[in-house]
């Protein structure tokens, strides 16, 4: 291994047979592939190295070190190996070799929507518990995901195991919170402080996304589906009420704060009608305006909503 923990190895193309392209992440293509030596099916994430870059991009190195650190948790997709290869132009490419998981939450939700069925409540509960558990592990190790969405929550349909993937934008955060760049998260799952231009944020950005995913599992529709940053904010305000200094101290000082239409909060049950009382209570704690007041992943696991989940320790 060299200093970066990247193994110069058999070229990835000699070691693997690409079966199909399964996606395109922010930093490169993802293939389903077979390891020739063992026959094992894996996910190969090919990371592009930009023309002007000497060596491996820092985003990739960061992802590798974070994933190696987090690989112990069953709810984080496992990074099994890193291989270097050379592409047709003679440029270095990196292949991250991940365990292969057969579907994701976006496809899972879509299959129920298309069938006109609800996802069974105990399934929602089981998936949410695993998501909270995986995020508690990330946050406990000082890692924010910052791009949680159904598409990067992988799922094994047979075992109903959920695994958090695509920690590409994650960066280890240490207290005090550093200033962060803005280019994160799909709009629908983006926390209001990010939409309003906050430069210091914390685990609350992930917990907001977890809340949005919770609501979507129950209704099969995104709870806040905006097509611009402004529309996204207005959708949130229409349901939760327009925030003010009383409910969210400091909100009017945020960079992108303006005077917005004044909406009164509606009951969450209007947006998520078939969620029980304990579920609505947990959801309201995840969608709390003031980031520091948002429930933590660890606390969420102890919420009464999960009380009747059988055998939590096996999840």
Swiss-Prot record:
Positions of the Protein kinase domain: 16-306
Alphabetized Gene3D superfamilies for the sequence: Phosphorylase Kinase, domain 1, Transferase(Phosphotransferase) domain 1
Catalytic residue positions: 147 (proton acceptor)
Keywords recorded for this protein, A-Z: ATP-binding, Kinase, Nucleotide-binding, Phosphoprotein, Serine/threonine-protein kinase, Transferase
A GO term, aspect molecular function: ATP binding
GO BP: hormone-mediated signaling pathway; protein autophosphorylation; regulation of G2/M transition of mitotic cell cycle; regulation of meristem structural organization; regulation of mitotic cell cycle
Binding sites annotated in the UniProt record for ATP: 22-30, 45
Pfam annotation, one family: Pkinase
Chain positions with Phosphothreonine modification: 181
Keyword Transmembrane helix attributed: no
InterPro entries noted in UniProt: CDK (IPR050108), Kinase-like_dom_sf (IPR011009), Prot_kinase_dom (IPR000719), Protein_kinase_ATP_BS (IPR017441), Ser/Thr_kinase_AS (IPR008271)
Enzyme superclass (EC): transferase
PROSITE patterns per record: PROTEIN_KINASE_ATP, PROTEIN_KINASE_DOM, PROTEIN_KINASE_ST
Tissue specificity annotation: Expressed in flowers.
Family (UniProt): Belongs to the protein kinase superfamily. CMGC Ser/Thr protein kinase family. CDC2/CDKX subfamily.
Protein name: Cyclin-dependent kinase B2-2
Gene giving rise to this polypeptide: CDKB2-2
């Amino acid at each position: 291994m060299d200093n970066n923990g990247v193994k110069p190895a058999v070229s990835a193309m000699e070691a693997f047979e690409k079966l199909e392209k399964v996606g395109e992440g922010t930093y490169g293509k993802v293939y389903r592939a077979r390891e020739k030596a063992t026959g094992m099916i894996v996910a190969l994430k090919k990371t592009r190295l930009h023309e002007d870059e000497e060596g491996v991009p820092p985003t990739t190195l960061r992802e590798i070190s974070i994933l190696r650190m987090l690989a112990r948790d069953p709810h984080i997709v496992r990074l099994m190996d890193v291989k270097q290869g050379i592409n047709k132009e003679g440029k270095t490419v990196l292949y991250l070799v991940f365990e292969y998981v057969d579907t994701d939450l976006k496809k899972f939700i879509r299959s129920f929507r298309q069938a006109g069925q609800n996802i069974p409540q105990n399934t929602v509960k089981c998936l949410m518990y695993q998501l909270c558990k995986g995020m508690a592990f990330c946050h406990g190790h000082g890692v924010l995901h910052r791009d949680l969405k159904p598409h990067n929550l992988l799922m094994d349909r047979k075992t109903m195991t959920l695994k958090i993937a695509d920690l590409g934008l994650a960066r280890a955060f240490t207290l005090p919170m550093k200033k962060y760049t803005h280019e994160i998260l799909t709009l629908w799952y983006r926390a209001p402080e990010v939409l309003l231009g906050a430069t210091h944020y914390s685990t609350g950005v992930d917990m907001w996304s977890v809340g949005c995913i919770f609501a979507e599992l129950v209704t099969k529709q995104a709870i806040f589906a905006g097509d611009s940053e402004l529309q996204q904010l207005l959708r949130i305000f229409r349901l939760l009420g327009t925030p003010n200094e009383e409910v969210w101290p400091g909100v009017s000082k945020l960079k992108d704060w303006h005077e917005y239409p004044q909406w009164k909060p509606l009951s969450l049950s209007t947006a998520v009608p078939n969620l029980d009382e304990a579920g609505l209570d947990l959801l309201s704690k995840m969608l709390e305006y003031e980031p520091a007041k948002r429930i933590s992943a660890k606390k969420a696991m102890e919420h009464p909503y999960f009380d009747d989940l059988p055998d939590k320790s096996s999840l």
